[in-house]
Regions:
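Functionally constrained cores in energy, signaling, and assembly domains
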Residues: 40, 49, 84, 100, ...
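Ampiphathic alpha-helical segments that act as solvent-exposed interaction surfaces
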Residues: 90-126
Length: 126
C-alpha cells in the first residue's frame, strides 16, 4: 500500500470523526518499512478549521504498535501533555497522561474512540 494513500485515508477518517476540522497526517519520525508489519509508527494528526487556518491546539499524536499479535493505538493531545490519553487495543482505556492511571472518558472522548475504531478497520486491510 502507498504511504500517501494510507495517510490520506487516515486523514479522511479524522475528518469524519473530528468535525468540523479538516486533517492532514504525517509521520513523526521514520515511517515503517512496510504497512501492517510489526514496526512501531508515530503520526501527527494536524487540524485546520473550515477557513484552512491551522489549529495546533487540536493536533493529536497517534502511536500505532503491535504487542504480540495485537494491534494497539495510543492517541494524545500534542498541546496538552496533561490531558487524558486514549489507549485502544481490544477496547478503549482512558488514562491520566502524567500517572498512567485509568480515568473516566473526557467529554470529547467519544469522537477519539470512534477515530480509533476507524483506524483499526483501515489497518486491518494493511
Amino acid at each position: 500500500m502507498d504511504f500517501d494513500l494510507w495517510l490520506a485515508d487516515l486523514a479522511k477518517a479524522a475528518d469524519l470523526c473530528l468535525k468540523p476540522y479538516r486533517h492532514a497526517l504525517r509521520f513523526s519520525g521514520e515511517p515503517p518499512a512496510v504497512l501492517g508489519d510489526s514496526s512501531d509508527c508515530a503520526l501527527l494528526i494536524e487540524a485546520r478549521n473550515d477557513q484552512g487556518e491551522r489549529c495546533p491546539q487540536r493536533d493529536l499524536e497517534l502511536e500505532i504498535y503491535r504487542s504480540g499479535s495485537e494491534l494497539n493505538l495510543m492517541i494524545s493531545w500534542v498541546q496538552d501533555p496533561e490531558a487524558p490519553m486514549l489507549w485502544h487495543g481490544s477496547h478503549a482505556v482512558w488514562m491520566q497522561a502524567v500517572s498512567g492511571e485509568r480515568c473516566e472518558r473526557p467529554a470529547d472522548g467519544a469522537a477519539l474512540e470512534a477515530l480509533c475504531r476507524r483506524i483499526r478497520a483501515l489497518l486491518g486491510g494493511a
